[in-house]
Every structure is written in C-alpha cells, then in structure tokens.
C-alpha cells in the first residue's frame, strides 16, 4: 500500500494587513422595543396633527363622538366574546344597549352517531326511561338519521303512543317529514297503526280527527278469492272480473268443463247438435272422463298402499331436473382405501366360488361319470 504525506504550504501571518481584521457578529439587544417606541411616537404625532386639523376645521366634536362610539362597540364585543359570561348585548339605538342573559345551551358536537342511533332505537322500542335520559342530556329532539326519520317518526311507525306523546310535549315538531315527504300520521297509517292515530288525535286535538285518519276499516273475507277486502268496497269486489271468474255457480258463469276446444270446432258442434252439454261427460252415453286422470308417482320400493300419497295430475313443473334425478346414486370408489376394500371383496367372492367347486371326490366322480 502506497502512502503519501501531504503538508500545507507555510502561512505568512506576519504579512497580513492590520486593517483586514476578522468580522465579529454581535447579537442585537432591545431592537424590537426601540422600534415599538419609535412607531408609537410617530402614531401619537399623527393623531395630534389630525386632531389639530379637525379642531381647526370645526369637526372636532363630531369626530370625538365617532371615536367614543367605536370604543363602546369594542368594549361590547370584548364583553360578549368572554367565554365566562353567558350574556348577549343588544344595541337598542346609537347611545343605549341592553344585556340579555342567555340560557346555557348544549352543542350538537357533544353527541355522536351512536347517541343518535340509541335515541332513535329507544323511541322505536318504546323505552321511556332511555328517552328521558337522552332528553336530560339535551339531545336535539328533532335529530334525524340518514333517511330523515326523527324519534317521533320511529315511535309513530311502531305505534308507541306514550313515547310519541312525551316527545311532542317536549317540543318535537309534529309537521316534520322524511325524505319521502311522509309525516307522523302518514307513517303510522302506512304501518297499519290506525288505533294509534285515533288515540293521538283524541289526546292532542280532542277527537278532531281528519278524514284521512278515521277509525280502522272493517274487513270482510271473500272465500272465493281468498282475500280480505274492506266492507265498503264489497260491491266493487263482487263486480270485479276476478270474483266473477272464481264464482262458478253464478248464473251465466263461464263453463268449467276442462275441454280445451272452442265452439268453432266441428266436433264440438256435432256433440252439441246431438244434445250434449258441457256439464256432461264425453262419449256416446255422456259418461266419459272430462278431466285428466290423477295419478300417484311412486318413487320408492315400499308396498302398494303403505303410504297415503296425494293423487295429482302434474307432479312436477316444467324443466324440473329433480323429477328425473335418481335418488340412489351408486358409490364409486375414489380413495385408495376404498379401492383396496373393493379388491379384497372381489377376491373373497372368487375364493368362495372356487371353494364350492374344489377337487373333491364327489365332484371328481360326478364329472367323470362314476356316480
């Protein structure tokens, strides 16, 4: 390894110019205070000059009034911005003002989404104690969720009258609407809470219930159509096409013969000409089958009559793969253990078969004609 020694050239310090001395940096002391003092002196000089000019021009008194009013407003602003005093200053005129004491208010930022959801859930479940606890915490009574529902709407949707009454008495807005423009009454009627609506109007309106929230309608059951209909709409339902088609015994009802041929068919017209009617059976003597024969689909190995099965015309729908699916699937050996087990079973069967035809005396004599 090659090393080299490098030395700096000799410095001639004695040849330096005495005027070229090193620069020394000194930290400033009280420069800011001096500048502030100088600026304040300049401001006072400008104000004295302006006051002297205003006094000379005759507007000194007006200018002083403006300055005094500005100082009063500044004091009012400082007083209202003080967080320790709950007061509000109301200016009545140019020279007078009033101080009004404010009630302590709770900010909405103190409640999170969990509190809002708990408040709405308590209204939905009818939990009066939980509702009172949230009201004591000064929660906004008309707070809404993502869908625009308030606690009053949740209570009305479930028919919780006591909760809805408590919220309305504590100042809840009865005319609030959700994102679908539905109010408290509309939501209750939509959920079938007509008794709740009647009770609500009886309590708050002394029974002055509007026509939209009348007593629950009486429903009647139509056995032919298998539906419930309002009692005042029974005549409309009876005259409907659905009810007339289901009423087979009515005069002039459509025939239910099950024959899928029309009056234009030549065979149909020949049978009618011979005195046949749709209520009679087919054939020369009118005693034949008019409907398809109902059968029983047997898919097991149980004996006949062992099971009480229902006779049907159609046992499965179209494109139903389960109808042609084999219920018992043969097990195919897939693992090595199953293959070995199957091989041992086949060997055992072959061994037993050979043992039955072993080279015994009786078998030998039989095949050689000695018996």
From Swiss-Prot:
One GO MF term attached to the UniProt entry: nucleic acid binding
Organism domain of life: Eukaryota
Residue windows of the ANK repeats: 147-176
SMART domains according to UniProt: ANK, G_patch
InterPro entries (UniProt xref): Ankyrin_rpt, Ankyrin_rpt-contain_sf, G_patch_dom, GPANK1
One Pfam family hit: G-patch
Biased composition (Basic and acidic residues): 32-47
Residue stretches of biased makeup (Polar residues): 48-57
Domain G-patch: 263-309
Region called Disordered, residue ranges: 32-57
Record keywords, A-Z: ANK repeat
PANTHER family assigned to the protein according to its UniProt record, in alphabetical order: BAT4 PROTEIN-RELATED (PTHR20923), G PATCH DOMAIN AND ANKYRIN REPEAT-CONTAINING PROTEIN 1 (PTHR20923:SF1)
Protein name: G patch domain and ankyrin repeat-containing protein 1 homolog
Source organism of this protein record: Caenorhabditis elegans
Classification of source organism: Eukaryota, Metazoa, Ecdysozoa, Nematoda, Chromadorea
């Amino acid at each position: 390894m090659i090393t080299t020694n490098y030395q700096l050239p000799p410095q001639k310090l004695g040849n330096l110019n005495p005027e070229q001395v090193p620069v020394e940096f000194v930290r400033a002391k009280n420069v800011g205070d001096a500048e502030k003092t100088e600026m304040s002196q300049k401001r006072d000089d400008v104000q004295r000059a302006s006051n002297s000019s205003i006094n000379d021009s005759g507007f000194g008194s007006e200018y002083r009034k403006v300055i005094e009013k500005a100082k009063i407003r500044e004091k009012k602003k400082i007083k209202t911005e003080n967080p320790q005093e709950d007061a509000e200053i109301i200016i009545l005129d140019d020279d007078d003002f009033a101080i009004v004491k404010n009630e302590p208010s709770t900010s909405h930022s103190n409640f999170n989404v969990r509190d809002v959801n708990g408040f709405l859930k308590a209204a939905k479940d009818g939990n009066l104690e939980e509702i009172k606890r949230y009201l004591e915490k000064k929660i906004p009574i008309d707070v809404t969720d993502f869908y625009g529902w308030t606690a009053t709407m949740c209570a009305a949707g479930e028919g919780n009258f006591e909760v809805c009454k408590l919220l309305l008495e504590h100042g809840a807005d009865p005319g609030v609407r959700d994102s679908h423009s539905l109010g408290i009454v509309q939501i209750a009627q939509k959920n079938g809470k007509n008794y709740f609506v009647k009770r609500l109007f009886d309590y708050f309106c002394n029974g002055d219930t509007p026509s939209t929230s009348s007593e629950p309608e009486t429903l009647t059951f139509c056995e032919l159509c298998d539906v419930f209909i309002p009692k005042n709409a029974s005549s409309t339902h009876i005259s409907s096409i659905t009810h007339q088609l289901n009423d087979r015994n009515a005069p002039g009802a459509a025939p239910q013969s099950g024959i899928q041929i029309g009056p234009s068919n030549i065979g149909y017209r020949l049978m009618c000409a011979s005195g046949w009617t749709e209520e009679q059976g087919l054939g020369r003597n009118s005693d034949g089958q008019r409907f398809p024969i109902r059968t029983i689909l047997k898919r097991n190995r149980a004996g006949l009559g062992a099971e009480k099965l229902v006779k049907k015309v159609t046992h499965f729908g179209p494109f139903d793969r389960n109808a042609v699916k084999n219920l018992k699937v043969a097990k195919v050996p897939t693992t090595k253990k199953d293959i070995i087990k199957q091989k041992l079973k086949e060997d055992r069967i072959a061994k037993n078969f050979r043992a039955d035809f072993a080279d015994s005396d009786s078998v030998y004599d039989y095949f050689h004609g000695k018996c």
